[in-house]
Amino acid sequence: LDHEYKELCAEEWAKGGSFFCYTSDNPTSLASCCRVLNEMSDNTFSSTTGMTGVMTGSCNVITLNINRIVQDYIHTWKNWEDHIVDGKCAFPFEWFSESFSDLKNYLINILERVYKYHIAYKTMLYEMEDAKMFSDCNAGYIYMRKLYSTIGLIGYCEAAQFLGLSVSNNKEYKDFLKLVFGTVKEENKKNSIHDSKRPFLFNSEAIP
């Protein structure tokens, strides 16, 4: 056991960042080195490395900076400058949480644009695959229909700190994360197109 590395990981985890750990007693989802997470409807385990014979992965990633989104959302408020002191929100989180539904709608509007970009890009990839322009696809190693279009998420710790939250195991922080990740999860399912020939499947990637 590398005790020095263990202590480093424990220290960083205690601060709420830098390292990501995903564990599951019931493997009903995908997890890869790039932290792709997506529920599996058939309750089976698959590896994104392809070593199990299951071909999965991402054909494209668009990353959203949650910190930027939260601050841009607050900039839509009337006299928003009055609510910022020393670069952070100057009002209790309970007040902000009352506008969660508005922030959710703001995030959904951004996600709707992201899905359009993803669909347009993957449509181009499908056309290139049909034209036999990908040697790996021609050889049967990869199929575009098996690949996900991924939405990366960064800056959620910084967004929480901007709102005056402690990045730790506490109710307020977890409520904020549930809002962000829950909204993305719902919209991924809602906007996925399960076409037999040209499916468009979305998942999310949490980047520490």
Enumerate the language-model features and the residues they cover.
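Core structural elements
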Residues: N138-A159
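Well-ordered alpha-helical scaffold segments within catalytic/enzyme domains
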Residues: E158-S166
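Conserved catalytic cores of very large enzyme subunits
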Residues: L1-R145, S166, N170-P208
